[in-house]
């Protein structure tokens, strides 16, 4: 009798522990979160059809390099499978390139040095849980990035620097996996179009240099869910 009672206690305790462990393993995706990420950017900063002195100029900078970022936001569970989220993120870059201007298709004595410095994005995210731990999602929204450009001319020997923010939109997709308690690992691809900005160059009588910027990025990150 005592042996049967002891077996029942063990069985009940085991079931309780198993249920509790299972509950801990299933992340509640709703609520606030904060995350860190790192990755690589392929940024194109293209000066196309810039006119001055009766000539047309072109340069294409490949500002490729590393990035790190931080993000925060809030998720809403729409039902058992669908997650709606809103995200604010900040990224800083180590990505720079230089290119010799083409003057009517011929290399000129002007070099354009370009770099992407930092970016801020405000995004919405729609995700689908394929199981309790794995979320597939798409994301999109507003993005603005600070660009630095240095225009160097050989003859006459002069140069001019500019910093400006370019606005546009961003869209992407990715996945998140709850690998431990309140932590998830994230892998994401993002495309960003920062459109075209005219940079007026004083040393060329304020001739506008149309600079079009676009980005492809791959990032890996870790998120903590509160």
Residue positions per predicted region:
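Gram-negative bacterial Sec-dependent N-terminal signal peptides
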Residues: 1-23
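Gram-negative outer-membrane beta-barrel domains
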Residues: 3, 22-226
